[in-house]
Amino acid sequence: MRRASDGAMTSRMSRDSAIKISRWLLCSAGLGALCVGGLKSLHAGERIDADRQKYAEQMEQTYSYRFGKGQPFLPSIAKIEGDTFIQPGAFPTAQYCQHCHEAAYHQWRQSVHANSFRTPFYTKNVGILQNSKGMEFSRHCEGCHNPIMLFSGQVTPRPALSDRDSDQDGVTCTVCHSIQKLQPAYGLGSYVMGVPAVMLDEQGKPIRGEVSFAEITAHVDRHKAAVMKDFYRTPEYCAACHKANIPETLNDYKWLRAIGLYDEWQRSSYAKQSPLPFYKKDYQTCQSCHMPREAALQRDVSTKNGTIVSHRWIAGNTAVPFLYGYDEQLKKTLEYLKADKLNVDLFALARTDGSGLIAPLGTKTFDIKPGDELQAMVVIQNKGVGHTLIPEQRDMYQAWTEFELTDATGKVLHASGRLNGEGYLDPDAHSFVTRLLDAKGNLLVKHEIWDRHTTATDATIQPGRSTLVRYGFRIPKDGTGPYTITAKVNYRHFDEAFTNFALGDKHPPYPVAEMAIRSRVLKIGENSPIAAEPKDNAEWMRWNNFGIALLDEAQYAEAKNAFSEVTKLRPDY
């Protein structure tokens, strides 16, 4: 199943290559005025603009202006220069860009951007919206998932012309690199698309459509001026799509926030815009984390010292590379998720008889007796993520804690947070998902955000903050020990119910990433202090994270006591 569509993708690439070759044959056979000779005899942009006008007039004949004649793209707020439809062919393909940027193309092809539309995880969900409310409502999604189809006027029940080739490519090079300006950071496609141009002429006027590679390499400065804007390197650029809301137009209820990664980043220490964070971090943007420099394994003219700016946009999506067999992308995604994003601290033990707190574990001497009833306090710190855990679509992305008590033979005596044989998570597990409810209080499990009226739970961890999870267990009465307690945080795209909805229930198990783990040994009798492990936080920080978690639980007296311990250890903090 994982590689089922690879053949189709290869066929598609071959067809695109043939189209590209045909275009250049036309240029060399007498229409070269558009491609060579300084482009003096006819400006290619004039032809593109004329074609656009004719195309738009034809598309307007059957287009459904459900939200008003002057608002063709609502509920998305994406706009395009000229305020009318544009033919899909006006966007040079990613294969065209591949000619000079093979490494970037290779990375992009495996990215979520390149697969933003075609995956069943997306199409099955948006299909519910189209069938229940109408195709026009899916424009809410397509401003970010399939902009070429949105701006070409094909997100309508009966388009006058149909060209769905770009469905396979999602967000292409010339989608991102044709955005001319940003609207206020509302998300939901808060950008203004330009008519794609890969080069400027001598007067600084955009040359629409494809030009010869010889022209580009002869005038690289004019190519860069056409396809790069300073704001492409800002968080606000990413916020245009990585922030969203549910307008009343979509839900027939009221405006609701959907995702807010940009807002969460602003509240983090990485942004340097908020007084609220507890820890100081170096300034980092979306691009710092998700577009680091990466070794260029293929030819690419933008290579510097063997690297290019990554066009993988590695984050948490393991499902797309697993589905399409992109092993390299999957490997890097799993490595990214495990790269010190979280800290799991088995911070304390509490006896259920109320005889006191043993904290922080590892720094105090304490006794354990057979039959003791204990509570482990697990503190989970979001230490390396610039937004929440879970980010974005919190209702179907799944992160949770797993806890185990094992004996000396490895036998599991107590467990929480396991997956059953069918891939479903223990319903009693501590999960970081958000549960969405419709107007009647029904749980929404297929990401039907247009039916959402309220949120039942939201257990996500804000950037730089912590949460506290408690686990009760009993030491066996006849046990001799030693015993081991282990806590870890797991993550997967997507929860089993949503994966089954998208793929059916015959799919292989989808990857689960172990983001952080910590174990401690409990002996019968005396347990002495032990040396900290390299991944452990300093003692003052362990108390601080415990206090932060208590503060967020509104346990103010207990939080104050924890922070008092911090000031004893760090008077300068």
Locations of regions flagged by a protein language model:
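Primarily the internal scaffold of c-type cytochrome electron-transfer domains
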Residues: 45-88, 104-137, 153-463, 469-538, ...
